[in-house]
């Protein structure tokens, strides 16, 4: 093979051959010398006892004298580390949290003094990992410079809470009843209040409304099942039709002297029934809907009673007209009966009634009594039941002629009749 001649003074480089050549073996790194098993075991043991440790477990994973699992024959199986208890785990977490929290706030001069010392000209700067390990507050100080002041105050408060003694893990009362028992208004430790709604965190307006409801509903609910300490006895008397004096309702509170079964918190519950999957807002809404329906039913009953009362009033007027003396006029009673019989028919409009009233007034002023009687006999008798209203009773009184009304007033009638016919006496003055 032809080789080019090198210049004088140039560096002589060995030619690179193929991977299988011997030149490649000479150019590669020299291998480490092979160690015997006893020497290897000694080296690994020295490294395990020194800096080489398993995080979290340390050298406790393997028995003393063992370098690694699989080295040596006939060794004991590896031992697992002991499980951490709840208290050790809490202490470990607390220590980790303290290392993450920033140090307390200091002034500018103090912060400069507490800052890590700068290495001198002859000293060597330590790596950051070793600084963080030796100084646990390094990370906290670094975070304190970056975080805002409010968040630092929150972290300080959290650090103070962590510094306090830990609460006992076991408590006599279950955790789901603890929140209810702490805020129970009656007694601080009442095991019978678990069904009450937890009002902690609710708005003040809702709490005030619930207290008002409880005060209103406590005497109405009466004795609850299984509560023998406080109960209300109410005696109700039947209504007597002959006007006998009805005795008043009497309520007497009797207390049980033995004191067994005392449940002071149950009477403050505003609701008798609360479902398991129902929230406090749903219970309140259901209660108010029920109360609203009761109020609406009372209003409807009052409206339905108004026409009944008007019918009673006009029925009494008809009876008084029937009781008029026959000696006044021979046809007066017939006319009053004819006018009263028109109330039991159906279908009379407002325009027709006004026309009839105008006919009555014109006839009373111009025609004699006999012509008015004939016109009244020819008049169709239709209903005034649609106008049986307390505001229209004065218009219905004008159906009678003025002469008959004046004669009735002269003879003398009951006081109530004067009041009903007062408008009829004022009509001639207006004309």
UniProtKB/Swiss-Prot annotation:
Underlying gene: C9orf50
Biased segments, Low complexity type: 106-121
Biased composition (Basic and acidic residues): 22-32, 122-132
Location within or outside the cell: Cytoplasm
Alphabetical keyword list: Cytoplasm
InterPro entries, alphabetized: DUF4685
Keyword Cytoplasm attributed: yes
Lineage: superkingdom: Eukaryota
Gene Ontology cellular-component annotations: cytoplasm
Residue ranges, annotated region (Disordered): 1-37, 102-132
Protein name according to UniProt: Uncharacterized protein C9orf50
């Amino acid at each position: 093979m032809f080789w080019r001649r090198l210049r004088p003074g140039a560096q002589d480089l060995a030619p690179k051959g193929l991977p299988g050549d011997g030149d490649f073996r000479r150019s590669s790194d020299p291998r480490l010398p092979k160690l015997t098993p006893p020497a290897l075991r000694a080296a690994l043991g020295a490294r395990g006892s020194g800096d080489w440790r398993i995080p979290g477990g340390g050298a406790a994973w393997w028995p003393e004298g063992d370098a690694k699992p699989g080295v040596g024959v006939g060794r004991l199986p590896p031992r697992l580390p002991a499980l951490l208890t709840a208290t050790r785990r809490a202490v470990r977490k607390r220590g980790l949290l303290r290392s993450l929290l920033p140090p307390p706030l200091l002034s500018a001069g103090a912060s400069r003094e507490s800052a890590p010392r700068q290495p001198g000209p002859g000293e060597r700067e330590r790596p950051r990992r070793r600084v963080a390990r030796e100084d646990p507050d390094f990370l906290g100080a670094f975070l304190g410079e970056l975080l805002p002041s409010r968040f630092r105050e929150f972290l300080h408060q959290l650090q103070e809470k962590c510094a306090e003694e830990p609460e006992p893990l076991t408590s006599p009362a279950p955790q789901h009843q603890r929140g209810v028992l702490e805020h129970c208004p009656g007694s601080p430790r009442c095991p019978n209040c678990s069904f009450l709604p937890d009002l902690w965190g609710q708005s003040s307006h809702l709490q005030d409304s619930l207290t008002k409801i409880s005060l209103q509903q406590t005497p109405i609910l009466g004795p609850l099942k299984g509560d023998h300490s406080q109960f209300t006895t109410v005696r109700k008397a039947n209504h007597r039709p002959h006007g006998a004096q009805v005795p008043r309702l009497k309520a007497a509170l009797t207390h049980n002297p033995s004191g067994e079964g005392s449940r002071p918190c149950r009477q403050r519950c505003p609701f008798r029934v609360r479902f398991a999957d129902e929230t406090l807002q749903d219970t309140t809404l259901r209660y108010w809907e029920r109360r609203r329906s009761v109020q609406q039913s009372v209003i409807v009953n009052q409206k339905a009673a108004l026409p009944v009362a008007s019918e009673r009033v006009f029925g009494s007027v008809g009876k008084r007209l029937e009781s008029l003396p026959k000696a006044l006029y021979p046809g007066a009673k017939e006319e009053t009966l004819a006018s009263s019989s028109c109330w039991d028919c159906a279908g009379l409009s407002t325009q027709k009634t006004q026309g009839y009233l105008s006919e009555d007034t014109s006839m009373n002023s111009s025609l004699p009594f006999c012509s008015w009687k004939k016109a009244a006999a020819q008049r169709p008798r239709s209903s005034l039941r649609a106008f049986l209203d307390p505001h229209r009773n004065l218009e219905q009184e004008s159906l009678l002629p003025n002469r008959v009304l004046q004669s009735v007033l002269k003879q003398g009638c009951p006081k109530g009749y004067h009041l009903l016919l007062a408008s009829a006496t004022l009509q001639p003055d207006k004309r």
